[in-house]
Amino acid sequence: MAGKRSGVRITGETVHTYDLHVIAADVDGIVTAAGGWLCDRARAGWQVTVTVPPDRDVRALTILGLDVDTHEPALHALPGTAAVAVDARVLRDDERLRERVLSLVDAARAEVTVWGDPSPVGPDGRFDRVVHRLSAAARAFKARALQTTGQVAPDLAVETFVSAALWYPPDGADLMPLPER
């Protein structure tokens, strides 16, 4: 990791690279809720690393082109990463992690994206509802990954999240705000 210097943003002394660290409660949930977006990020050159609990079958994640880390706790990976994605169930159950993730948002240190019930991050306006439209490749890889987990492929065209600190340019964004209802 030390040799990587393909920075996308400089804030003060920190160079952020195209690194996305993902913290998931389980493999099935991440593939269903965020597999296409993560696959598209990996195919676009991001280093996507998923932390899942130990002793899980991670074949579906490797199909999506993702690296897997089964170390716990996942807090060690958060400093210096350009983006963090977290399962809302993990945020609900781990107060220390929730506080750490929200501190990244408050300090504008990283893009933070959450899938699932957004209530653990609060309704205070720091997070916006966003959507990712899956590429054809991501739809195909996600369908295969879902088969590996024994799940039936749902509508694979879009995935929705809540996200904060969208720092990349609007013309290159892969997470687009949802219109207000």
Residue ranges and their predicted role:
Residues R109-R181:
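Glycine-rich, aromatic-bearing surface loops/beta-hairpins
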